[in-house]
Amino acid sequence: MNFRKHLFILLALAACSACHAQSNEDFGYEPLSPDSAFATGAENLWGHEVFPSMFLFREGGYKGRTAVVANQTSVVGATHLVDTLLRAGVNVTKIFCPEHGFRGTAAAGAKVDNSTDPKTGLPIISLYGKNKKPTPEQLKDVDCVLFDLQDVGCRFYTYISTLHYVMEACAEKGIPLIVLDRPNPNGHYVDGPVLDTATCRSFVGMHPVPIVYGMTIGEYALMINGERWIKDTCDLTVVKMDNYHRDSIYELPVAPSPNLRNAHAIALYPNLCLFEGTNCGVGRGTDYPFEWVTYGTDTLDLRHEAAPAAFSLKYLMEMYRRVGTRRAASADAKPFFLKSNFFEKLAGTLDLRRQIEAGMSEADIRATWQPALDKFKKTREKYLIY
């Protein structure tokens, strides 16, 4: 980040109410106080010299043609980022949206079509339809891209894959990218198997990182650039947060996706998403998605269990045991794992399914991924900004 090269200062807006964290003693680590003066990157955009100097500031707003990668989480106080930019006179020309769409209502995996925002009339281009990367044609009339999505710190949550493709497209066209940083609600630890890119790379896992990587989306963008996971270097600026502490709780003001509705589900998500590669359900279509696991009438109810402060295989291994018992009693019972390789894509390794089927303990399984995890932690340190 080099803010000196940026000469433009956005017009001051009316005071925006800062989002702040709320306590949740289930997490077991220190919450932020309401008066901690916390501010997201989007809130810090105002008054910072962040727009590229090649574009001139003119009275009435920034006239460089700006594309925004955003969804329902892209808020400045109680106002959407796009509305905030337009009120400031920024020349927003189009919106790119990720999985779940601009309003965050599309189901997981559902195709998101291009559309028009009824409020602003701006075109919305889907990055979760037939193409997941902005095309040269879509960027030909763009001078700058703003990226503002709320991540949850898990490798298989696809917003970081969208970030990868946006960075790649911007780098190829020489377009500056500005990432507005936001907290990682699972940012207080690093754990899980590191993805094997040779065998398990997909849109639910593109980089050699563990399931829980303990970085903000801004830090992750720096790592994509620094580790050369894209061919060309992206002209990247990260607008930092104020008073963000990795070990503090941050209750998201807006649900990041339809099935992560509260802090408890978000904390369980790293542990339960692996079930998406099995014949178990994780509560989709109910009032408690990612707070329980089902296999037929067998239920693992986690709604009232203290939110985990670390990644664990205990839920997966417990349900594997229960399904084994049920299958022994019924020849019609479905196998635990799906026949496809989706579990491997989520786990990031071909080994985990085999290890569980072989009856290995969690401690022994962990020992197999520890060397790669330790190596990642050292790499990660280079890109931490908080």
Q: Residue spans of the language-model regions?
A:
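Bacterial Sec-dependent N-terminal signal peptides
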Residues: 1-26
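Short N-terminal or domain-adjacent regulatory/targeting segments
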Residues: 23-65, 72-78
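Glycine/threonine-rich flexible loop motifs
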Residues: 151-163
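Glycine-rich, charge-decorated loop segments at or immediately adjacent to ligand/cofactor-binding or catalytic sites
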Residues: 104-109, 178-200
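Short internal beta-strands
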Residues: 91-100, 180
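Glycine-rich oxoanion-binding loops at beta->alpha junctions
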Residues: 112-142
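Conserved anion/nucleotide-ligand pocket segment
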Residues: 200-271
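Conserved functional hotspot residues or short segments at active or partner-binding sites
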Residues: 294-367
